[in-house]
């Protein structure tokens, strides 16, 4: 896939998942770390998110699980919780995703994610 095609797919995926917030992230990087914005658009959202085997709901569920597990990624986790809602996950599915993480990452990280989600739902 050519760069322009990846960029086109990336912009479409980013808009579907993150709405205007995603565009704001890319614009904020422009002039400071524009290459990172390009990698986000072309690689993450242009290539990875456009693979066929998983739908966007599954991809966002995986993404929030990874971000929750890492810790220290609260801004990105908040964006992807909203992205999960945008692609059709509901609050119950997001909470169940968090609960599934408890045995593997512990209550503190899960409670932090619940707090972010709760504030995002309101």
Predicted segments, located by residue:
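Extended intrinsically disordered, low-complexity coil regions enriched in Ser, Thr, Gly, Ala
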Residues: 73-93, 109-121
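Short acidic alpha-helix initiation/capping motifs at coil-to-helix transition points
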Residues: 38-41, 71-77
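A general alpha-helix detector
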Residues: 13, 44, 79-80, 97
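Substrate/cofactor-recognition hotspot
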Residues: 60, 107-108
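A short structural micro-motif
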Residues: 68-69, 87, 100-107
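Acidic, glycine/proline-rich low-complexity segments that act as flexible tails and inter-domain linkers
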Residues: 1-57, 110-122
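Short, structured motif recognition centered on aromatic/hydrophobic residues
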Residues: 59-67, 97-98
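Structural motif
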Residues: 52-58, 88-93
């Amino acid at each position: 896939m050519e760069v322009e095609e990846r960029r086109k797919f990336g912009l479409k995926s980013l808009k579907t998942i993150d709405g205007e917030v995603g565009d704001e992230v890319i614009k904020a990087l422009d002039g400071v770390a524009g290459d990172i914005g390009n990698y986000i658009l072309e690689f993450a959202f242009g290539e990875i998110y456009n693979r066929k085997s998983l739908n966007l709901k599954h991809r966002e569920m995986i993404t929030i699980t990874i971000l929750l597990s890492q810790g220290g990624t609260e801004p990105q986790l908040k964006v992807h919780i909203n992205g999960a809602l945008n692609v059709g996950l509901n609050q119950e599915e997001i909470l169940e995703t968090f609960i599934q993480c408890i045995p593997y990452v512990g209550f503190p990280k899960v409670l932090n994610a619940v707090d972010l989600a709760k504030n995002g739902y309101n």
